[in-house]
Amino acid sequence: GHDEYAGLGIQQISWNRKDYEYVAAVHWSAGHEPLLLVQNRRQTRDQVLSVHLGSEASEGSAPVGSTTVLEEHANDQWLDIIQGTPAFTPDGRLVCALNDMDADTNRLTVDGRPFTPAGWQVREVLDVTDEDVLAVVQRTPELDGYEAPDGLSPWRGDADGHDARSFDVVSFDYDGNVLPMTARPGSWSASRRGEGLVIS
């Protein structure tokens, strides 16, 4: 029938569809419940939801397909969607996008705490581990107050070329330190698995 695909059953997911009409993102990582990012029609409010997957509802457990709100965000103008968010770290921390209007920067948070520096516009999250997030960024030099622990620019003498025209791949640890993965300005992406990293 229409309710099954190739023998797979379909489970309806419940959330406040009246106030949050759009499903903006879905992410499901090993060992964790699926995440949904839902938005209102004006795309000024969103909710990050976890989807309960328990096989059978036992007394006191949430019904299969029900959701729990993990985070909510609002912006009177517009909420940007950053591909690759929301996501769980392997150890269960929640990484989300933050449209930080005070810093004029699209940032990342871990469990609600911003950890990417102001002036580093996160455009896409490529990979999330317990130690870091691999991301594509555009740097806004006039907003960039980042100081590396060694006092040196992440790109040494070439920092001026890594501005809003350059889509760079960097690693952010959860203390906000930046490790560039691309040396030259350009339009870059990457794929990482374990210790391997392919830059394209």
Question: What are these regions, as identified by a protein language model?
Answer:
Residues 1-200:
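Peripheral, non-catalytic segments that deliver or gate enzyme domains
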